[in-house]
Amino acid sequence: MNLDSALAYQSGFGNEFSSEALPGALPVGQNSPQKAPYGLYTELFSGTAFTMTRSEARRTWMYRIQPSANHPAFVKLERQLAGGPLGEVTPNRLRWNPLDLPTEPTDFIDGLVSMAANSGADKPAGISIYHYGANRSMERVFFNADGELLLVPQLGRLRIATELGVLDVAPLEIAVLPRGLKFRVELLDPQARGYVAENHGAPLRLPDLGPIGSNGLANPRDFLTPVAAYENLQQPTTLVQKFLGQLWGTELNHSPLNVVAWHGNNVPYKYDLRRFNTIGTVSFDHPDPSIFTVLTSPTSVHGLANLDFVIFPPRWMVAENTFRPPWFHRNLMNEFMGLIQGEYDAKAEGFVPGGASLHSCMSAHGPDGETCTKAINADLKPAKIDNTMAFMFETSQVLRPSRFALDCPQLQSTYDACWATLPATFDPTRR
């Protein structure tokens, strides 16, 4: 990889970006010249149908040493993704301790574990959710034909070398990789763990702000896209793809991360969650958690998300005469939560970094007994919730846990008991 410029970034969200690792590698005034500069091949990378509205269209022109078409047939791999098939649908509330870190050499692909999904990979909607754990860098290259990937590291820094450049991503940052983009995950620390949402629907975008105005939440300038960086390596390289949930591999005689220049908007990017401009009440009551939305994948129903990525970052709590934790709730949406660091303000214990929970459609949830008792009796001074970062993958379709998720020892069998300590405080003689 030509690393001289690899860790520079371009700022913005949804921009028409352009980058070249060699001067003059980008054609001027056209996309597909008869002879591309430096003897490169021209290739179009489409993330949406040609006839999408211009505001929705995602595509990038690449100028590369070898075209992607130069590969032998793919063969289904003997080792498939961990986690197995989906299990039985359950309305019960589920919570998991962190999955064990691998002890055998495990790269990012082998470390992916299926946790839940609500759609087949052949459908243009829905999501799949994975945990990952790894202790070695990938030596092969991977692409996912089934959807866009949202990576949420919880432990360990990652260097993600892609066709369009390099992203360094640490805990408290996220990365989004377009469907089909080739990449290699390298570990910058001895071990890595985190979460992945696979988006089978419309590409993620910033949510509309409505009456919030033209600024706030995740601001476009804080999203970073890499600059062009390429490998000119003539050596055996394994290329793995995920296609309809199955892993397939082929052997190349060159590195597929060989794009010297590119322009377009179908690009990878990263975002530092600490840059999120948190909105909250300065009077009373607890606003809806939609104010914490970082990115959204919409459905055809206006306002109904295929996937919302929501965070619960450090913030001040100043509401007067208010029960400040998230309220008790029954929800149309389905909520898969994770914790990157610290504690979640609705759960005093049991929900730890690297863990997860699933509350399905209309599953009652809310603060546990200890949190509730403290909040009812708290002295309502301004207080800061600090050193925390919880997040949620929220989706409008019911998530079905994998068989692994339902059978693994990390599933907390006593999760329901956290609400059993809620006291009966009703007294019809006292208002």
Swiss-Prot record:
Matches recorded under Gene3D superfamilies: Jelly Rolls (2.60.120.10)
Enzyme class: oxidoreductase
Gene Ontology process terms (BP): L-phenylalanine catabolic process; tyrosine catabolic process
Protein origin, superkingdom: Bacteria
GO cellular component, as recorded: cytoplasm
Cofactor: Fe cation
Pathway: Amino-acid degradation; L-phenylalanine degradation; acetoacetate and fumarate from L-phenylalanine: step 4/6
Keyword Oxidoreductase: yes
Disulfide bridge partners, by residue number: none
CDD domains: cupin_HGO_N
Binding site for homogentisate: 344, 365
Task of the protein: Involved in the catabolism of homogentisate (2,5-dihydroxyphenylacetate or 2,5-OH-PhAc), a central intermediate in the degradation of phenylalanine and tyrosine. Catalyzes the oxidative ring cleavage of the aromatic ring of homogentisate to yield maleylacetoacetate.
Subunit structure of this chain's protein: Hexamer; dimer of trimers.
Protein name per its UniProtKB record: Homogentisate 1,2-dioxygenase
Lineage: Bacteria, Pseudomonadati, Pseudomonadota, Gammaproteobacteria, Pseudomonadales
